Regions:
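Feature for soluble, non-membrane regions of globular proteins
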Residues: 1-192
Length: 192
């Protein structure tokens, strides 16, 4: 099965001023597209040729895993943001956050510190553990909770290509701006 670049759930300039159109043109239009193209080339003639993206992520390794996971991670990241996002979660998700961190502000500080402290290229995730509790997990490179027992709820891409055009080497400024985009409805649906 040929995998395609999923459409963004908003216009290329819709995340400005937090994330510029130029960043999306490179990050989505070039980086994400390249992962899709490489994945399609790598799976030809393999057991993964007709597999779904999630099946490939869960069962593959090496280059096939790296590219499939990056396609999945990026799609998840785009869906976790929206124009005029931000604010605070409500309902069961807010309760889960308060149970683990005491308050949304304390969660936000912990998640931001994890993003900024995630060495090198990778992802910072809010995940739901098997016991229903929440946690913050850092992964390196293409690694994703999808291939393990944790259920991903939200992610922040901390690869430099996610923020370098807009924020240069100021990852902390990018992370602070990310909070103005979070799509809490998407996160809550993942939590349910």
């Amino acid at each position: 099965m040929e995998h395609t670049l999923p459409a963004l759930p908003y216009a290329m300039d819709a995340l400005a001023p937090h994330i510029s159109r130029e960043t999306l043109e490179y990050h989505y239009g070039k980086h994400h597209q390249t992962y899709v193209t490489k994945l399609n080339n790598l799976i030809k003639g393999t057991e993964f040729e007709n597999a779904t993206l999630e099946e490939i992520v869960k069962k593959s390794s090496g280059g096939i895993f790296n590219n499939s996971a990056q396609v999945w991670n990026h799609t998840f990241y785009w869906n976790g943001m929206k124009p005029d996002g931000g604010g605070v979660p409500t309902g069961a998700l807010a309760d889960g956050i308060n149970k683990k961190w005491g308050s949304f502000e304390d969660f936000k500080k912990a998640f931001s510190a994890s993003c900024v402290g995630n060495f090198g290229s990778g992802w910072t995730w809010l995940v739901k553990k098997a016991d229903g509790s929440l946690d913050i997990v850092n992964t390196s490179n293409a690694a994703t909770p999808l291939s393990g027992a944790d259920k991903p709820l939200l992610t922040c891409d901390v690869w430099e290509h996610a923020y370098y055009i807009d924020y240069r080497n100021a990852r902390a400024k990018y992370v602070e701006s990310f909070w103005g985009l979070v799509n809490w409805d998407f996160v809550a649906k993942n939590y349910a």
